[in-house]
Amino acid sequence: MEKLNIGRSSIEVPFLGMGTWAIGGGSWWGDNDDALSVKAIQTAVEQGIRWIDTAPIYGLYHSETVVGEALKHIDRDKVVLSTKCGLEWRHETPVLHKVVDGTAVYRDLSAQSIIEDVEDSLRRLGTDHLDVLYTHWQSPDLGLYPLEETVEAMMKLKEQGKIRAIGASNVTADLIRGYCRYGQLDVIQEKYSLLTRRIEKQLLPTCRELGISVQAYSPLEQGLLTGRVTMETTFPEGSTRNSNPSFQPARRKQALDLLAKWDDLTEKYDCTMAQLVIALTARMIPGLHVLCGARTPEQVLDNAGALNIKLDGADAVRMKWDVDAIS
């Protein structure tokens, strides 16, 4: 199976990773069957999905705890494990991020907070190192949390062998350059799908220049690109889909019309629409890592099918043209 580098690190991994936000449960995702999610993570590794991504804020530590339980039953060397730092609810800071299930979550990118985050994550995950550590959200006030301090803390953790690669999520091109100026940056994690392509112009040129990998989250646009959503599909009050621009009537119709053009390709490649979309998304940007969420073995198996799709050049060109036409 073809593998991709993670930035300038020595880590190589297949393009498809497993996101575990939903495994955290809570009001965003509802109750979670933890035993089933442990099996889902095991299934992912068995199917060749080696990059498992989590974060402390997913379920307020719950996702990390479930991932840690799964790792007890998996050869650690077979897993590329990433988590995040910089969101804090152990104490209050001047920067409120959001309220999650009644808990006020703050941003804190100080060296002390980052080091404490990593030590706590290592304990919950039951491992002695992280393959990738992301800063989850960036500070809106670099006077409060200087980027140099943030990067130096991560570089120190790398020197200690507690992390292998440095990542950042939800960044700007200027911040990417700042990370590299003060230390290094191997990978960024950003929202990217066939419907949400802003990073192609805003971030990708800088990443290419500096040898930084990109990992895309939400490639199926919260399920809109799976082929299972219709114009009549509704979502519960409070669902983030209701405020997602891609789910608004005009854009939703564009998305569904786009998928309808590819029905013949799902037959040709004997795959689901979701698998076809994942395979194409991986082709949109050379070397792109794609992160797909799942919390059941069945969902994992559906995502993993994308690893076996080898798009013909002509089909890829046709599909990219279709995508460009609605961008």
Residue ranges, per PLM feature:
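Short, acidic/polar
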Residues: D31-A44, S110-R124, T172-R177
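Active-site groove signature of glycoside hydrolases
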Residues: L122-D141
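N-terminal small/glycine-rich loop or linker at the start of catalytic domains
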Residues: S9-W28, S82-A104, Y134
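Acidic (Asp/Glu)-rich catalytic clusters
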Residues: R8, A70-R76, R123-G126, Y179-G183
